[in-house]
Amino acid sequence: MARSTIVLRGLRREYPSGEATVVALRDLDLTIEPGEMVAVMGASGSGKSTLMNILGCLDRPSSGSYQIAGRETASLDADELAALRREHFGFIFQRYHLLPELSALSNVEIPAIYAGQSRDERRDRANGLLARLGITDRASHRPNQLSGGQQQRVSIARALMNGADVILADEPTGALDRRSGDEVLRILDELHADGKTVIIVTHDASVAARAKRVIELSDGVVIADRATSTVSPAVAAPTAAAAQAQPRSRWPWQSRLDRIGEAFRMAMLAMAAHRLRTFLTMLGIIIGIASVVFIVAVGDAAKRKVLADISSLGTNTIEIFPGKDLGDVRSSKIKTLVVADARALRLQPYIDGVTPTVSTSSTLRHGPLEANALVNGVGDQYFAVKGTKLSAGRFFDADGLRDVSQDVVIDEKTRQTFFSDDPDGPIGKVLLVGRVPCRIIGVTQQQQGGFGSSQNLSVYLPYTTVQARFLGNSSLRSILVKVNDEVTTKAAELDVTRFLTLRHRVKDFVILNTDDIRKTITNTTETLTLMIAAIAVISLVVGGIGVMNIMLVSVSERVGEIGVRMAVGARRSDILQQFLIEAVMVCLIGGGLGVAVAYGLAATFNALVPMFQLGLSAGSIIAAFICSTGIGVVFGYLPARQASFLDPLAALSRD
């Protein structure tokens, strides 16, 4: 490390005080050579503390020149001044200024973290310094577990951590008893003997007498500058300890990772120190994240349920009805939609299945029981087109259509109505449909509520049977068409429209496209989900504002800590990073708890409503964590920036 000659020329420091100006230092000229031990004396208000703050780059002169190791400090920015404090100066404060959350060892290590030393390097050096100062057995103790003398020794070890060549001691014995004070002065004598430049600010003449040179101030002016001994100043040569302090060459990212690790550690300590406040801060994030994740899960489940219900109408299907359009009051009088149309459509290459449908209502009877039901006349491909499954028996086939058979397939509701107490089941039994006796050959599985389901009883007969035995005409209620997977239902709809218009010579039919219904309802579901999620996002924003508020409080509470870190060499970016990471950690942990709450809500909902199952997608969870991190960055930046722009001297003064 380059030896630091301190040169002050015409240095002046003024402070505004209302409408007046207070002059703390007046046109000071001073030179301190490397290796000197200097005492700066003066009464309260003489300017000695102001001089020490300027010498340690904690404050700037109003005018004049201050050079350290040949560098003019007036031209340096905040980070360059931090580098000077980190590399050239070691501070010993009257009030110690140790961080209460950290052990003695960790307090000593702080300057080395900002200097880029590796964890092993700084741990070894810190232990060595504590051993040299006789408090190695207190390395794991926190400041409140140490005596005043022990705390001051930790402060001295911290000042020596980076091998500083200038030690600035502000009333180092002022808060100590006589015995502890003598030990501290002995240590300062040893540092001077090692070649350090030692500058002691004191009002005690007996302390000043230990120095080789005494500078007296009064009203900001040097009134005396005298040597107390004829002994020559120590030769300013780098000592082994100083050489050891130089960090070995490391990649920049390694130093950056160390500083980030320190920031994470301090964030966790700060959060643990105020558990209730931290939890209440997280609560807004927890509620917001849980709401968003849960609502997205509900929206996805609703969409799946709707799509499953629409699938009950048949996937990739279109249905053709008589009439100019849906709801045409004259549709019942249009008799042009016939079985021949269905047979012609079946020959088209883009058609996978076609079934004519007719329907009527009738009374079902079995033994003493009777009930009204919907009688559906369908083709043999109907069940495949609709995706209907059996719980028992079989479907009728093309032979049943041709033979106008009286084989009937009943639904689950019909089975429960007429055969719930029959141990043999309904298969093979005779069911009277109106006046037509029918043999039950199959039972369909029960459909959940939704599209394609009905509270009415339903039975299925060949459409030929219904036309001949119930309706007495050949016209159809509709033709249900399943389109090949290679063809879109929209394209098939256009082709079917052209085909039937040519056959009928007029467009006297309307086509219902289930995919259009699917898209409409899906879009509606997504819109509703988005609207509800937007409301939930508001709670996230409120939570983010809470994070900002608490971080501002945290900054105001930890001004002293910020000042200490800046005094030992922390850059503005280090302070910004520390408080930003703390805000992000609060939001990330809140986000994790929010996801856990959403899981709990989903599990409870699934247990209470088994027919409507919620599932949390990985995408929504990842989005939740990204969102919570973003909230931490956005709402934590302002408090973190405020912390990083604090004046180090003002921060130390407010501790």
UniProtKB/Swiss-Prot annotation:
It holds the Pfam family ABC_tran. It is a multi-pass membrane protein. GO terms for biological process: response to antibiotic. It is an enzyme of class 7 (translocase). Residues 6-244 form the ABC transporter domain. Keywords: Antibiotic resistance, ATP-binding, Cell inner membrane, Cell membrane, Membrane, Nucleotide-binding, Translocase, Transmembrane, Transmembrane helix, Transport. Its EC number is 7.6.2.-. ATP binds at G42, A43, S44, G45, S46, G47, K48, S49. It comes from the Bacteria. It is found in: Cell inner membrane. GO terms for cellular component: plasma membrane. GO terms for molecular function: ATP binding; ATP hydrolysis activity; transmembrane transporter activity. The keyword Cell membrane applies. The keyword Nucleotide-binding applies. Non-canonical ABC transporter that contains transmembrane domains (TMD), which form a pore in the inner membrane, and an ATP-binding domain (NBD), which is responsible for energy generation. Confers resistance against macrolides. PANTHER family: MACROLIDE EXPORT ATP-BINDING_PERMEASE PROTEIN MACB, MEMBRANE COMPONENT OF TRANSPORTER-RELATED. This is Macrolide export ATP-binding/permease protein MacB. The gene is macB.
